Curated annotation (Swiss-Prot):
Protein name per Swiss-Prot or TrEMBL: Protein unc-112
Domain of life according to the entry: Eukaryota
Localisation per UniProt entry: Cell membrane; Cytoplasm, Myofibril, Sarcomere, M line
Span of domain PH: 402-507
One GO MF term: integrin binding
UniProt-listed Pfam families: FERM_M, Kindlin_2_N, PH
Organism: Caenorhabditis elegans
Gene label: unc-112
Keyword Cytoplasm: yes
Knockout-associated phenotype: RNAi-mediated knockdown results in impaired mobility, mitochondrial fragmentation and disrupted integrin attachment complexes in muscle. This leads to degradation of muscle proteins in the cytosol, myofibrillar defects and disruption of sarcomere organization.
Domain FERM: start-end pairs: 288-614
Similarity comment text for this entry: Belongs to the kindlin family.
Domain remarks in the Swiss-Prot or TrEMBL record: The FERM domain is not correctly detected by PROSITE or Pfam techniques because it contains the insertion of a PH domain.
Length: 720
């Protein structure tokens, strides 16, 4: 008989199955047959406990296999349960410590039996955050493991007890968090000596990990106390008593502590994780939980720290009326990513971010302006009227003329030898999705010097308003591969029009689209806010637009507003304060919510926004390489400078899946297949980023906004 073991007494073919009732801390042995179903086993167990209580939230958990027995009609034989099996009868909802994007720690009851996608959805609903598919949960990883990266070696020993820092990889597999092997010494050399935090002891934190310190006197399993663990600033744990995490928020009654986050600054006494290179930036994407598996299946247990973060940088319909919590939490995550140098940005941009942050802080207690008395129906009718007017205008434009830009610009091809001669001047024309250029305007009827389709190109900016520098950087797909092309504009107005056209063309839209003029105005507004950043090199036109400087608060701390990289470069803190004060003059009319939204828009305009780095090894390759997943593409990058070497568009992708046996991600494109093994993060993480962005790209205001969870898991599940 399959269930017979030595020493086990058999009565009528029955055998004893031990089950631990966790919340009562008692163990019961139930006499069972292999054909008993899971539901019947729970009924017998409850009867054996002889305790009057509500057991509806309890389920059976199999610790050795790390899975819930959720199919109540399946039998013990079907589940592979024998007399040697140890089961637990435990509540599905348990207490967890959730760190929000603004670094606040809250205690919440979370369902540990459903997949993390559902758990995130419920948590976001309770917090008042719409579009939960943009967020995800992340495990706490000890900082020393975060610095070192993950092992390249497979764990061939089968399932083991999961410890802090370990990540589950597909069904019944595990990978340990260990240093990259010696074969990856080239990566280790890039790390060594480049991060000031690497040689220091204590907890390392960044915008994704910062503030994950436990309450005073408690630490996660396997984590030792350190000098920074009980730092006064970092152990702040604001609990919002007015929020009941078992009930949803109704009637827009959002908690003020979630809309206006408490003040928190990086402490000089606590070492911080500021990524110094692309290997360290790749480490930030470790720890994302598998959306299709439950928390306990991934080694998250009661009382553990879980990080809630915006994962996908594609934000749908940010509305101040419905999203005060969502806007603030997104703003806070953006703020910390800027302060801790997760995104490269210029000094001018840093000053603008500081000015917007200052305005949001100063306006914190000021009431938002009263909205008009229009109800929701009137507002929707107004939006519909505007959309119909724009559509009608577009149709008229299509019948009469196709929008076109034509102007003299300067250009450069950085990878050509001619680049040493600097920029050349030519006459450019932009029509539909195509960019052409001639020697002069009189040559437009002859063959162009160059003709490119901008659909699917990569567009980034290199702008300094103070220095009158307006560069548009294009990475263009051609038959010979990707080529770099830089356009140099002469003025803000010219730059705004051409940059807007390039951005829309990269998304497959022409200037006839109704969003073109909005894009132009958005770029102009951003340039206008940067125009008062106190740069001495600015011309008289820029200087004349500066508003009067504001007097900074007495408790103004530059470390709370400016990245330490630029604080160190400044001659003095007074110089930084003066620049922030000057820049603030251009944003002082904004409300707190408007300042946060402008901060988010400026953050989204950064070249690295929406790019997630991973260290991988391509099939049959010897050395590791840098890969980036973006909103609409996958790219292979130079690991030293981040320069794009090759790009694969999601639009050209036919199929992708994970081979769990060798932990490879295989992607089939129209013209080639690629296969690689992620080294810096779990292979499921990379797969979810690709499938998740494809899922988010399907959202539109014209379609129902009901969350299609089945489609999400189809795109992110990892199975062929």
């Amino acid at each position: 008989m399959a269930h017979l073991v030595e020493g086990t007494s058999i009565i009528d073919g029955k055998w004893q199955l031990p089950i631990l009732v966790t919340d009562l801390n008692i163990q019961r042995s139930i006499s069972v047959l292999g054909n008993l179903n899971v539901g019947g086993l729970m009924l017998e167990l409850v009867s054996e406990c002889d305790v009057e209580r509500d057991w509806s939230d309890h389920a059976l958990w199999w610790p050795e296999k790390r899975r819930w027995l959720q199919h109540t009609r399946s039998t013990l034989d079907q589940n592979g349960i024998t007399a040697e099996t140890q089961l637990e009868f435990t509540p599905m909802h348990k207490e967890a410590r959730i760190q929000l994007p603004d670094m606040q720690m809250i205690d919440a009851r979370v369902d540990f039996s459903v997949n993390s996608f559902k758990a995130t959805k419920k948590l976001c609903r309770d917090l008042g955050i719409r579009y939960s598919e943009e967020l995800s949960l992340k495990r706490y990883i000890p900082p020393e493991d975060l610095r070192r990266g993950t092992s390249d070696a497979d764990n061939m020993n089968g399932p083991l007890s999961m410890r802090p820092g370990e990540e589950s990889v597909g069904p019944m597999t595990l990978r340990k968090a260990a240093p990259i092997f010696a074969s990856q010494s080239n990566l280790d050399m890039r790390r060594r000596g480049q991060s000031p935090a690497l040689s220091q002891s204590g907890h390392i934190f960044n915008a994704h990990e910062m503030g994950t310190l436990p309450r005073h006197g408690t630490l996660p399993r396997g984590v030792s106390p350190s000098p920074g663990a009980y730092n006064d600033t970092m152990r702040r744990t604001p609990i919002m008593p007015s929020i009941s995490f078992s009930e949803g928020l109704e009637n827009e009654q959002f908690d003020d502590a979630l809309i206006h986050s408490p003040r928190l600054a990086p402490s000089r006494d606590t070492p911080v994780f500021r990524p110094q290179n692309y290997v360290e930036k790749a480490a930030i994407n470790r720890g994302w939980l598998d959306s299709s598996r439950s928390l306990m299946e991934q080694g998250i247990f009661e009382g553990d720290i879980i990080l809630l973060r915006f994962k996908f940088m594609n934000f749908f319909d940010l509305n101040p009326k419905y999203d005060p919590v969502r806007i603030n939490q997104l703003y806070e995550q953006a703020k910390w990513s800027i302060l801790l140098d997760e995104f490269d940005h210029t000094e001018e941009e840093a000053t603008l971010f500081a000015a917007l942050q200052l305005q949001a802080t100063l306006q914190r207690d000021s009431p938002e302006p009263e909205e008009n008395n229009k109800d929701d129906v009137d507002i929707l009718l107004d939006e519909l009227e505007q959309n119909l007017d724009a559509a009608a205008l577009n149709r008229r434009s299509d019948l009469t003329q196709v929008p076109e830009l034509a102007d003299y610009l300067k250009y450069m091809k950085p990878k050509k030898l001619a680049a040493f001669k600097g920029f050349k001047r030519a006459f450019f024309s932009f029509r539909d999705l195509y960019l052409s250029y001639h020697q002069s305007s009189s040559d437009v009827n002859s063959a162009p010097l160059g003709h490119f389709s901008l659909k699917g190109c990569e567009v980034s900016q290199d702008v300094s308003v103070g220095q009158q520098k307006y560069h548009i950087k294009l990475l263009l797909p051609t038959a010979e591969g990707m080529i770099d092309f830089i356009l140099k504009c002469d003025s803000e107005h010219q730059y705004a029009r051409w940059m807007a056209a390039c951005r829309l063309a990269s998304r497959g839209k022409s200037m006839a689209d109704s969003s073109y003029q909005q894009e132009v105005e958005s770029i102009k507004n951003l340039l206008k806010m940067q125009s008062g950043n106190g740069n001495e090199n600015g011309n008289s036109n820029t200087a004349s637009r500066k508003a009067a400087a504001v007097k900074l608060p007495n408790d103004f701390n530059v470390d709370e507003y400016i990245s330490s990289k630029y604080v160190r470069r400044a001659r003095s803190k007074q110089q930084i304060q003066q620049r922030v004060s000057d820049a603030h003059g251009n944003v002082r009319q904004l409300t707190a919510t408007e300042a946060k939204l402008q901060y988010i828009r400026a953050w989204q305009a950064l070249p690295e926004h929406g790019i997630h780095y991973f260290i991988v090894r391509f099939r049959n390759a010897r050395k590791a390489e840098l890969v980036a997943v973006a909103v609409n593409r996958l790219a292979k990058l130079n690991m030293d400078n981040g320069e794009s070497l090759k790009t694969w568009r999601f639009a050209n992708m036919k199929k992708w899946h994970v081979n769990w046996e060798i932990r490879h991600l295989k992607i089939q494109f129209e013209d080639e297949d690629i296969e690689f093994k992620p080294l810096s993060a779990d292979c499921k993480v990379v797969h979810e980023f690709i499938g998740g962005y494809i899922f988010l790209s399907m959202r539109s205001k014209e379609h129902s906004q009901n969350l299609d969870e089945e489609l999400f898991h189809k795109l992110t599940g990892g199975w062929a």
